[in-house]
From Swiss-Prot:
PANTHER family: OXALOACETATE DECARBOXYLASE, PHOSPHOENOLPYRUVATE CARBOXYLASE. It comes from Pseudomonas savastanoi pv. phaseolicola (strain 1448A / Race 6). Keywords: Decarboxylase, Lyase, Magnesium, Metal-binding. Mg(2+) binds at residue 88. Homotetramer; dimer of dimers. Its cofactor is Mg(2+). It is an enzyme of class 4 (lyase). Substrate binds at residues 50, 159, 235. It catalyses: oxaloacetate + H(+) = pyruvate + CO2. Belongs to the isocitrate lyase/PEP mutase superfamily. Oxaloacetate decarboxylase family. This is Oxaloacetate decarboxylase. Binds 1 Mg(2+) ion per subunit. HAMAP family: OadC.
Length: 289
C-alpha cells in the first residue's frame, strides 16, 4: 500500500473534523504505538505533552520538556505514522514568538494538527489552581501560530480549561479564539452536556474535548450532534505499557508473586519522583506547597 504523505494525513484530519461524527484518539507516544493505532483502525492519534514528558524524561507534567525534545519525539512518530497525529503543544513553549517556532518545527515533523493552550506555564507552584494567561495573549498566540504555518492543511486548535474559570469567561475565550481564526477549539474540563451546550453556543468550528473518561460525556452520538469531532479520553495505552513493563521485569527478577498490586498511577508517581520537584520548588522558588 502506498505511504500517505504528511499533507495527505492533514487532509484526512480535516475530513474528519468536517464530518458529522465524533472520533476518539489513540494515545500515540512512539513509532510503534503509531503503527499499532493505524493498524487497529484508529482514525486519529494524539501525542500528549504529559506523555512525552514521561517517555522522554521520566518526569511529571510540570512543563519540563523542551520544544526540541518534544519535536524529536514527534519527528520519530511522523516518519512512520499512517494516521493523522495531533500534537499537544502545551503553551507553545513560551510567548507568541515561541509559538511561531513551535508551529514551524512541528509542521516539519509531520504533525497533522496541534493544540496551543492558554494555561500559564511553567507550573505556578504554591497556587491552588492553574492560572490562565489573558484572553488577549491567547488570541495573539493563535494569530502567531496561523502566521507561522506554511501548509494550510495543518490544523491549529486553540485550547482552554473550562473547569477553572466561570462559564461566561470560557464562552468569551472560545468565541475570541474562533474569531482569531483557529481551525478548532479544544476544551478541557467540561462537566456534562449542559455545560458543553453553554460554552459551545455560537461555535462554528470543530470542537475537541479532553474528557479524561468523564462518564457524563459518554454519549458519542450526542457529542457529534453538538459539534464535537475529536474526543480525548486520556492515555490509557501508555499507562498500560508502564504497568506491563513493571510486571514483566518484576517477574523476570523472580520477585515473589508474578503480578504486582501497584496500579499504573502508583507506578507513574513512584518513578517520576514528583516529591523531588516539589522540594526543589520549596528550596529555590520560595514556595510552601
Amino acid at each position: 500500500m502506498p505511504k500517505a504523505s504528511h499533507q495527505d494525513l492533514r487532509r484526512s484530519f480535516r475530513a474528519l473534523t468536517s464530518s458529522n461524527s465524533c472520533f476518539h484518539t489513540a494515545s500515540v507516544f512512539d513509532p510503534m504505538s503509531a503503527r499499532i493505532a493505524a493498524d487497529l483502525g484508529f482514525e486519529v492519534g494524539i501525542l500528549g505533552g504529559s506523555v512525552a514528558s514521561l517517555q522522554v524524561l521520566a518526569a511529571p507534567d510540570f512543563a519540563l520538556i523542551t520544544l526540541s525534545e518534544f519535536v524529536e519525539q514527534a519527528t520519530r512518530i511522523g516518519r512512520v505514522a499512517q494516521l493523522p497525529v495531533i500534537a499537544d503543544a502545551d503553551h507553545g513553549y513560551g510567548n507568541a514568538l515561541n509559538v511561531m517556532r513551535t508551529v514551524v518545527e512541528l509542521e516539519r515533523a509531520g504533525i497533522s494538527a496541534l493544540t496551543i493552550e492558554d494555561t500559564l506555564l511553567p507550573a505556578q507552584f504554591g497556587r491552588k489552581s492553574t492560572d490562565l494567561i489573558s484572553t488577549a495573549e491567547g488570541v495573539g498566540k493563535i494569530r502567531a501560530a496561523l502566521e507561522a504555518r506554511v501548509d494550510p492543511e495543518m490544523s491549529i486548535f486553540a485550547r482552554t480549561n473550562a473547569a477553572i474559570i466561570p462559564v461566561q469567561e470560557a464562552i468569551s475565550r472560545v468565541q475570541q479564539y474562533q474569531a482569531a481564526g483557529a481551525d478548532g477549539i479544544t476544551i478541557v474540563g467540561i462537566r456534562d452536556f449542559d455545560h458543553l451546550a453553554q460554552i459551545s453556543e455560537g461555535v462554528t468550528v470543530p470542537l475537541m474535548l479532553v474528557t479524561y473518561g468523564n462518564p457524563e460525556l459518554h454519549d458519542n452520538a450526542r457529542l457529534a450532534e453538538m459539534g464535537v469531532r475529536v474526543c480525548v479520553h486520556g492515555h490509557a495505552a501508555y499507562f498500560a505499557a508502564i504497568k506491563a513493563t513493571y510486571d514483566c521485569l518484576r517477574e523476570q527478577r523472580q520477585i515473589l508473586g508474578s503480578e504486582s498490586n501497584m496500579s499504573a498511577t502508583e507506578l507513574t508517581h513512584t518513578y517520576t519522583q514528583p516529591e523531588d520537584y516539589v522540594e526543589w520548588a520549596r528550596k529555590f522558588m520560595n514556595v510552601n506547597e
